[in-house]
C-alpha cells in the first residue's frame, strides 16, 4: 500500500513509515551485533543487542546478548537474560540448561538447583537435567546425593559419558576405587579416548598402589598432549615416591615451564639443590586424587 501511495503521490502513513524504519534499524543492529561478536568486539555487540531489544523483543537477540555477556565475564547479566528467556519459553529445557550452566560458572549452586527443579517439572526423565542437578549437589559437597543423581542420569541414558566420568571422579574422591574402576572400564570400552578418562584411570591406579601402571597411563596422556600439566605433576609425584629423583625433577621442570605460576615462590635459577627441595615440597602437598 505504501509503495502505491508513493508511486502515485498519495499520502503516506507515518505509523507505517516508523514501523518500517524500526524494523530496518532492528535488523541492522542485530546484524552488526552478530558481526561484532564474531570478531571479539563484545562491548559493541552488547550495545547493538540492547539497542535492538529497545526496538522490539526478540528471543534470538536476547540469546545473543547472554552469550556476549558470558564472553565478557558478566555472568550475572547473562543469567538474567537467560532467565527472562525461560519465562518466555517455560517448556524449553535447552534454555534452562543454558541458565543452569551459567549458574554453575558462578558457583551459585542454589540457583542451579532451582533451575533444575523447574526443568524436571517439564521433563522428569531428562538425563541431562539430572547431570546438571548432580553437578550442583557436588558443588555443595553433597557427594552421596550427587552420586545418586548421576546414577539416575545414567539409568536414563546409559551412553551419557559425562555422567559416568563425573561419577567415577566422585567415587575416587570418596575412596570407592572398585566402583570408580567400573566407570573407567565402561568409558574405555564405549567412549572415545580422552585425557580426562585417562587421568581418572591413572589416579585410580595410583590410589590402588599400582604406581607402575599409573605412570604408564600418565606417560600415554603426555604422548597425546605434551602440554598436560596435571599428567607431568602427578607422574612426578609417583616417580619421587619410587625413588626416581631425576625423573621427578624432570617432570617438575616441565610443570614449571608449562605453568610458571605453579611455583611462584621459586627464586632465581633452578639449581640442582633448589629444584630438588621444591620438587619434594610440591609433591608432598599434592592431592593423590588430583582433586
Where are the predicted features?
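Alpha-helical segment of the N-proximal tetratricopeptide repeat
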Residues: 19-60, 64-71, 92-94, 98-107, ...
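Alpha-helical adaptor scaffolds
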Residues: 97, 101, 135, 165, ...
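Helix-start (N-cap) detector for alpha-helical repeat units in TPR-like alpha-solenoids
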Residues: 26, 59-60, 93-94, 109, ...
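Terminal, low-structured helical/coil segments at or just beyond the last alpha-helical repeat
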Residues: 1-17, 247-291
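Structural marker of alpha-solenoid helical repeat scaffolds
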Residues: 21, 54-55, 88-89, 122, ...
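TPR/TPR-like alpha-solenoid repeats
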Residues: 68, 102, 136, 170, ...
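Structural signature of tandem alpha-helical TPR/SEL1-like repeats
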Residues: 40-47, 72-84, 106-118, 140-152, ...
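Canonical tetratricopeptide repeat
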Residues: 64, 98, 132, 166, ...
